[in-house]
From Swiss-Prot:
It is found in: Secreted. GO terms for cellular component: extracellular region. Pfam families: Insulin (PF00049). Its main location: secreted. This is Insulin. Disulfide bonds join C7-C36, C19-C49, C35-C40. InterPro entries: Insulin-like, Insulin-like_sf, Insulin_CS, Insulin_family. One of its GO terms (biological process) is glucose metabolic process. Keywords: Carbohydrate metabolism, Disulfide bond, Glucose metabolism, Hormone, Secreted.
Length: 50
């Protein structure tokens, strides 16, 4: 997922993969700006984990 734009189900699947058993909270529109409109890093994704 590094260097890709992640949108919709691809973004959700990637969050499941990154957060694993911790799960993640329902992100606000900010994650769409970070990961769908732009490219986000693994560290940015980790900020959405519980």
């Amino acid at each position: 997922y590094v260097g890709q734009r992640l949108c919709g189900s691809q973004l959700v699947d990637t969050l499941y993969s990154v957060c694993k058993h911790r799960g993640f909270y329902r992100p606000s529109e900010g994650i769409v700006d970070q990961c769908c409109t732009n490219i986000c890093s693994r560290n940015q994704l980790l900020t959405y984990c519980n």
